[in-house]
């Protein structure tokens, strides 16, 4: 079994942060939609972590100005992105996907290479940047380029982006002891 992923990458781009989340060695990208007509991805590894690929979410922070400032608008914004992903996947819950280099160039291509998408419902080539507001796309492109400078090969031609993962948790860490209990608040066992 492979150990837990040891890297976390982050880059500040303007007023946003782009970061990797939940690196899964030997992992898969899986379907996580909970509503009809929406596509959502997530990543996971089985216990043995012996899958063909490794995967990590690449997340860009969303500001209140992106969605209009209140919780209802934030949820509507998320649902709109998920509906766009569903449509871009061609319906049937396939996910839109693109090679990383293609995303950086705005080309919208996906070719068969060393990295084979694991998404169980299938993938459809798509310009992922067209699914997001321009500010988010620009930040993701800048962040991925910075990640390549930090970790050579991160934007390798065969690397694949499968999306959209719209339901990440905040990058807050809750310290726990060896039994999983919070070290800050006794009697609380954070999970998730």
Question: Model segments located where?
Answer:
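Residues forming the flavin
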Residues: 1-192
